[in-house]
A protein has these predicted regions:
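Short active-site-adjacent helix-start/loop capping segments
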Residues: 42-44, 75-78, 103-104
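A short, acidic, amphipathic alpha-helical segment used as a generic capping/interface helix at domain edges
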Residues: 49-61
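C-terminal structural segments of small proteins and small subunits
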Residues: 92-120
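Non-catalytic interface/targeting segments
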Residues: 1-52, 110-122
Length: 123
């Protein structure tokens, strides 16, 4: 699965999350998002998460050293296959609930790190 056209070109911190969406760069978005070096995109991940759900992130491997995966309200480990795909691509994968993922992404973005985030929306 590839991401939809960029909702916001470029990088921006996540200002708020909850109620099924996110706020960033003075905008709000309903649903899950991918925050990649090239922009912020609407994202409809498979359940359970699979490689095709993260293909857009993998396509930016040269610009990203780490992907923060926010799995929703609760922490949920991705499959060994998903972990292996990221390891093989040379991208670190950190998994946590979406709230922690937003905070971690913002800190690393503020440090100008080569980071991305795949964030599942929470109610």
């Amino acid at each position: 699965m590839t991401a939809a056209p960029a909702r916001f070109p470029g990088r921006a911190p996540i200002d708020a999350y909850g109620n099924g969406g996110f706020r960033f760069a003075g905008m709000s978005h309903r649903g899950s998002i991918l925050c990649l070096p090239s922009g912020i995109y609407a994202w409809s991940p498979a359940d359970p998460l699979d490689r095709s759900s993260l293909s857009s992130a993998l396509a930016e491997k040269d610009a990203m050293q780490l992907l923060i995966l926010g799995t929703g309200a609760q922490h949920a480990e991705p499959s060994a296959t998903v972990k292996r795909v990221f390891a093989d691509a040379g991208i670190g994968l950190e998994v946590m609930n979406t709230g922690a993922a937003c905070r971690t992404y913002n800190v690393l973005l503020g440090e100008r790190r080569a980071v991305g985030a795949a964030l599942v929306a929470v109610p």
